[in-house]
């Protein structure tokens, strides 16, 4: 509190938009949902009863999932190791974690399409990076399912989440113990609207929902303006 350090979270408008769409589809407010925003920046949110209760990003947009150029979760002692043993400055370490890590650091590419293309050609670094990316997402799915004591749906959104059937399949593989069963045929889509890509037998719905952050921002502004008008009218009545 003294230094104004807190958990901020990021991609909030995206998570809010798709979670509300998911709740509307499920038809119940008291739901347990994990929203997975996968783009060049990536984040996940655990949403219980319509409220965010945990998020992979915090004070900065660096931690959590492996991203295009950002590291995601690391052992914090690496920072001190780089500074003490290799004389990295704080600015150099910050640049390394923000701009030269993640998929770029693992493969030399920051664009998932390039990484997938290289993996298909047999590039071992790219194959490993795709496995690592899915593994990290799975860890958070398991963690969030535990803290919410169950799961009703997981939602994929943003550039990669909406447009990469391969990444969705990698993430959902071997999660049947949680009740997550992906339909391989349904998953071969890049939808322009809410689409269910899980099987009928899947207890947990797997949804792909195109995000619309601009619309969510407009809705928030209109809501804020309505509240201001209500307050103004109440004051005028006084």
Q: Where in the sequence are the language-model features?
A:
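Conserved active-site and cofactor/substrate-binding residues in soluble primary-metabolism enzymes
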Residues: 9, 13, 17, 42, ...
């Amino acid at each position: 509190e003294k230094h104004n350090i807190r958990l901020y979270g990021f991609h909030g408008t995206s998570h809010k938009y798709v979670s509300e769409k998911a709740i509307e589809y499920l038809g119940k407010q008291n739901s347990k949902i994990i929203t997975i925003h996968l783009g060049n920046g990536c984040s996940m949110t655990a949403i219980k009863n319509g409220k965010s209760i945990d998020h992979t990003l915090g004070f900065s947009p660096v931690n959590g999932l492996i991203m295009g150029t950002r590291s995601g979760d690391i052992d914090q002692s690496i920072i001190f190791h780089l500074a003490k043993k290799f004389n990295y400055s704080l600015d150099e370490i910050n640049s390394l974690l923000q701009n030269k890590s993640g998929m770029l650091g693992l493969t030399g590419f920051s664009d998932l399409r390039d990484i997938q293309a290289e993996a298909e050609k047999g590039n071992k670094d790219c194959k490993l990076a795709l496995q690592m990316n899915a593994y990290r997402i799975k860890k958070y799915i398991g963690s969030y399912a535990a803290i919410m004591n169950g799961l009703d749906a997981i939602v994929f959104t943003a550039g990669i989440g909406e447009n990469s059937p391969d990444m969705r399949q990698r993430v959902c593989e071997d999660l049947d113990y949680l009740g997550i069963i992906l339909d391989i045929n349904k998953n071969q889509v890049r939808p322009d609207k809410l689409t269910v890509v899980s099987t009928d037998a899947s207890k947990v719905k797997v949804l792909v929902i195109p995000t619309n952050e601009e619309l969510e921002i407009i809705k928030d502004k209109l809501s804020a303006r309505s509240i201001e008008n209500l307050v103004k009218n109440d004051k005028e009545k006084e």
